[in-house]
Amino acid sequence: LFKNFSFLLIGVIRYSAIEKYSKLYLKTHNHLIIKYFLMNFKPSNKSSSICRAVLGPTNTGKTYYALERMISYKSGVIGVPLRLLAREIYDRLVSIKGAEEVVLNTGEEKIRGKHARYWVCTTEAMPAGKSFEFLAVDEIQLCADEERGHIFTDRLLNSRGQFETLFLGSTVIEGLIKIIIPDIEIVSRDRLSRLSYSGKKNISKLGPRTAVVDFSVDRVYEIAEHLRTSK
């Protein structure tokens, strides 16, 4: 028993040392790793479709622009990071195209119209192996997120529409996008209105066209549920 425990302890120590060294190596040699990746990177699916990155701060109409582009095609898919946002976009598309032509797929919730042509999904739930004339991914700067970054990175590298692809997000990712997709068209968006602080408010008594922003996913759903029940 002691012998087996000793082997286990040595294994844990070795693993911890390797993990610590790996993190140190990544930290000190990050530029070399990126350089190696870029030298050896080859897109897995080359496409002749239009590819644009629409970049700018919040409240610049990026998502609205993507929806306008999507409904101009016979089929389309958009991936967004939040289920609530997916639901909002779904409702908007249903009001334009009708419920029979729209799909909502968030992993937890799936509503599929009888003649569905337009898909609204959380980024993780975007259908693999299905072709669309138009494809968009929102908040593409989440490529840098520790937990979900691999999903957004995969979409950036591999997901394309037949005729048009849009990546929406912050300007912080512009440099990386240009390196990965050299011929991409960058579209910059300016804020459409001015944001200002108006003091503390009672969240149950907010007026129409009020935006509630929280930086915790759990709090977003909690606030949304509170607003629904307080109406």
Which ranges hold each PLM region?
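Post-DEXD/H (motif II) to motif III coupling segment of the RecA-like Helicase ATP-binding lobe
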Residues: 144-196
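Loop/turn-to-beta-strand initiation segments
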Residues: 116-118, 131-134, 162-166
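Inter-Walker segment of RecA-like/P-loop motor cores
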Residues: 96-128
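Pre-Walker A adenine-sensing motif
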Residues: 36-45, 65-67
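Conserved strand-helix element at the start of the C-terminal RecA-like helicase core
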Residues: 75-86, 207-227
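Walker A/P-loop
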Residues: 49-65
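Walker B catalytic acidic pair
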Residues: 138-140
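Walker A/P-loop NTP-binding motif
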Residues: 63-75
